[in-house]
Amino acid sequence: MLIQINTDKNIEGHSRMNEFFSEEIKKELARFDDKITRIEVHLGDENGDKFGKHDKKCMIEARMEKKNPIAVTAHSDTPEKAFYEAVEKIKRSLSTTLEKMREH
């Protein structure tokens, strides 16, 4: 599973943060490891320099072989909170998608 972490110009994306988020993705999505080919994480601040509640956004896209990508988005006060909310959403979406695949 290839993991890509992307940030916009308003979120400082240093290597320690990228490593941390990559490890969290690996840990949280381990049970889907054989199904997922790539995960993309996009972190951003929708208000830029201005302060706003829930203006940090995390979009996670999971790509599976021969399937359409699954994408989820979460907003929160901090990039970390948005990330964890998006991880929970993508886990639920992947579980639902794989359950439907098994039923057919």
Task: List each language-model region with its residue ranges.
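N-terminal, polar/charged subdomain of small-to-medium soluble alpha/beta proteins
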Residues: 1-104
